[in-house]
């Protein structure tokens, strides 16, 4: 899974990326300090995997990972190549979802390229650039469909679908907010459009603001925007998260406890990303390795096996599965077997989040 972190210059985007990866990407008080996208692989916190590792004490511990890409700052006119616009658009096209960092704090020492703090204006600037880029893509798709329709009339419907979408985009609305028949949306999804991507708005506040975020006027403004398009908002203080990320694990837990938090804002972002993209994890365990594997919700057992190795899917026989909670209550796989909690599932079994799995195959 790849998430692109976007935002106008000086909204806290690179600070948040530093916190996410603890990579120390240059964070400077001027536009375009992030010219090439910084990429960081982040482990997904999973207490279930930690528990399995405590039982098996494996040689290798492999959590699921998310790839975060810190994408260059954006300005008005990016869709026409202003600033670093073309680079921005090509980099964001390669992501699965967008984390849009929106400034929700006042600080006269940190210059805002558009003037004062205004979440609605900032969201509209980036949305407009992405929508304009999508309009260009859709216009090309209509042109291609019309040309193909000369030899095959089925393309007439495709042209009509994209013409209707173009009208929607012309109104300044994203593909995410577009409603149409499921089969038409499947067709639209083949076009690699930017505003179809799921989005999380990261409301970046100062420490005082995030401590009482529900009463933060900027946060409330951003929530209203997100609600209108079915997006999610995460209150976060990027500077605080950067400090937390720099601590050792034990110190981190103590610091969070002092703040009255059960988890960091980054952990919440990762979990929200999983939910947003419809992802779950299944687990494999043994003395050699305990590992979490990421799959789409609704994935069947053979395809899940294929995530481990193509031979597992090709020669799939069955999956031996125990729900994590059952395994934990029993204390071991052997005890779970004795209680008859380990099930044998066939090729039509749909995987559940937290399934502890052993695949049987023959090639």
For the regions a language model picked out, list residue spans one by one.
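C-terminal-of-GTPase-core extension/linker across diverse P-loop GTPases
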Residues: 2-6, 11, 17, 144-350, ...
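Conserved Switch II/interswitch segment of TRAFAC-class P-loop GTPases
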Residues: 40-45, 72-82, 93-155, 168-181, ...
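Short, well-ordered loop/turn sites that connect or cap secondary structure elements
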Residues: 92, 351-352
């Amino acid at each position: 899974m790849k998430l692109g972190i976007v935002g106008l210059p000086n909204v806290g985007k690179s600070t948040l990326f530093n916190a996410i990866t603890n990579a120390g990407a240059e964070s400077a008080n001027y536009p375009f300090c992030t010219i090439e996208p910084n990429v960081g692989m982040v482990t997904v916190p999973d207490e279930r995997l930690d528990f399995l590792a405590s039982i098996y004490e494996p040689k290798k511990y492999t959590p699921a990972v998310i790839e975060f890409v810190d994408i260059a700052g954006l300005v008005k006119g990016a869709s026409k190549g202003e600033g670093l616009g073309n680079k921005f658009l090509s980099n964001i096209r390669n992501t699965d979802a967008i984390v849009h960092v929106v400034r929700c704090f006042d600080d006269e020492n940190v210059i805002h390229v558009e003037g004062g703090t205004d979440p609605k204006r900032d969201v509209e600037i980036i949305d407009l650039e992405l929508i304009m880029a999508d309009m260009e893509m859709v216009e090309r798709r209509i042109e291609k469909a019309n040309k193909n329709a000369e030899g095959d009339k089925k393309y007439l419907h495709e042209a009509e679908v994209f013409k209707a979408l173009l009208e929607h985009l012309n109104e300044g609305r994203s593909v995410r907010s577009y409603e149409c028949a499921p089969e038409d949306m499947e067709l639209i999804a083949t076009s690699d459009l930017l505003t179809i991507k799921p989005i999380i708005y990261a409301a970046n506040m100062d420490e005082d603001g995030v401590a009482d975020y529900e009463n933060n006027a900027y946060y409330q403004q951003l929530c209203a925007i997100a609600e209108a398009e079915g997006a999610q908002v995460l209150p976060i203080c990027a500077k605080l998260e950067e400090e937390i990320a720099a601590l050792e694990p034990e110190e981190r837990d103590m610091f969070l406890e002092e703040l009255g938090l059960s988890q960091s804002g980054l952990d919440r972002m990762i979990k929200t990303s999983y939910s947003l993209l419809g992802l779950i994890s299944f687990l494999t365990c043994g003395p050699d390795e305990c590992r979490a594997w990421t799959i789409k919700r609704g994935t069947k057992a053979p395809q899940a096996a294929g995530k481990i190795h193509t031979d597992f899917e090709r020669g799939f026989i069955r999956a031996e599965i125990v729900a994590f909670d059952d395994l934990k209550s029993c204390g071991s796989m052997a005890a779970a077997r004795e209680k008859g909690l380990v099930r044998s599932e066939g090729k039509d079994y749909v995987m559940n989040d937290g399934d502890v799995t052993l695949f049987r195959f023959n090639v």
